[in-house]
Swiss-Prot record:
One of its GO terms (molecular function) is S-adenosylmethionine-dependent methyltransferase activity. Pfam families: FtsJ, RlmM_FDX, RLMM_N. Keywords: Cytoplasm, Methyltransferase, rRNA processing, S-adenosyl-L-methionine, Transferase. This is Ribosomal RNA large subunit methyltransferase M. The gene is rlmM.
Length: 352
């Protein structure tokens, strides 16, 4: 199992290659990354047979920025038109017993077509794996991840459930709320799922908390905050959705989001303003560094080139700034499924 397969947003294969190559070099695990443009996946081929397993053991998936999902295996294998299950059982003879099964596809138009096949194929495959003793429900065991590039080509991979994506392919199944004024609302909801353990939501996303939404109009992110019954200052020169204003929980301030400062410390600051990432990074530095908020979710809009390098530079500058202030800050940064040419950062100021 010398190959690490990583899913990603189409068009960001280069960022995944740069990110995993940097980590592998730091960990002294030799190998090379390969991908095709807009293929929505990257393979990192290790020189050592156990290289992919060592990478997954040494890295925390949650700390990777651009990969949506990962799995280790020997590479893609071909399947016949018939007797696919028999071929897979033969391939899995050398694998450990697995505790769960996910059938995955790539986030491409071809992948969407393959998903129909996967839905039909999963039930008989699961039954065959259980009967053969290759699958039993136990989250302490590795997860079997089958990534189908077509009905005839599959990557037979493994990953630890607690060190891989929260959802198949890293894609959450979130329902767009009809009352929300824009689809951007799903970005903030996904960020909460990604960065905040579900059992902590009632404490960290509690009613009557104070929140500021910078660049709020028309109110997609504000809707999520109001839905949690927070008191929100919506900062934007543009108009807010009327249903949000009728809630009685929103104070609309028509000022520049980058100039606004709250009169008192707030629990949450969220920001989805289209601006150069360096300027947004400086905004994060001010709000967290000066104690204007306890937690923040902020989107960094990325340039067309050197996107991974730009994100790394901003995160490094933030860490250095907070260290110089003597602050303890928890970081998270991920390109979420609902993100486009951007990444989402979560920061939480901790008490020393």
């Amino acid at each position: 199992m010398n190959t690490l397969l990583m899913h990603c947003r189409p068009g960001f294969e280069g960022e995944v290659c740069a990110e995993i190559a940097e980590h592998a070099a730091t960990l002294e695990i030799p190998g090379y990354a390969r991908s095709k443009p807009a293929s929505a996946h990257v393979e990192f081929v290790c020189q050592d047979v156990d290289g992919a397993e060592r990478l997954m053991r040494r890295l925390r998936f949650a700390e990777l920025i651009f990969p949506r999902q990962w799995a280790r295996g020997p590479g893609f294998i071909e399947l016949p038109e018939s007797q696919r299950i028999e071929v897979l059982l033969e391939e899995l003879a050398s694998y450990p017993v697995c505790g769960s099964l996910w059938l995955e596809v790539l986030d491409t138009n071809a992948g969407k077509e393959v998903s129909t096949f996967c839905r039909k194929f999963e039930k008989p495959l699961r039954a065959a794996l259980v009967k053969a003793g290759r699958l039993q429900e136990d989250l302490a065991l590795p997860r079997l991840l089958l990534t189908f590039r077509s009905g005839r080509e599959v990557f037979v991979g493994l990953a630890e459930p607690r060190n891989s994506a929260l959802w198949p392919m890293g894609i959450p199944r979130l329902k767009f709320p009809r009352e929300a004024p824009s689809r951007s609302t799903l970005k903030l909801e996904e960020a909460w799922h990604q960065f905040i353990p579900r059992q902590e939501w009632d404490k960290r996303l509690a009613p009557d908390m104070l929140a500021v939404d910078l660049g709020a109009a028309p109110g997609g992110w504000t809707w999520q905050l109001v839905n949690r019954e927070m008191r929100v200052t919506a900062v934007d020169n543009g108009p807010m959705a009327e249903n949000l204003m009728y809630s009685g929980l929103v104070d609309h301030q028509k000022v520049d989001g980058y100039q606004y400062r709250p009169r008192q410390r707030v629990d949450w600051m969220v920001c989805d303003i289209v601006e150069k990432p360096a300027r947004t990074g400086a905004l994060i530095e001010t709000w967290i560094g000066e104690g204007l908020c306890r937690e923040a979710v902020v989107n960094l809009k990325l340039p067309m080139k050197q996107r991974y390098a730009e994100v790394r530079k901003i995160l490094q500058r933030l860490r250095e700034s907070f260290d110089a202030r003597g602050l303890k800050v928890a970081f998270g940064c991920k390109q979420l499924y609902h993100d486009r040419e951007e990444v989402t950062c979560h920061l939480r100021r901790l008490e020393r």
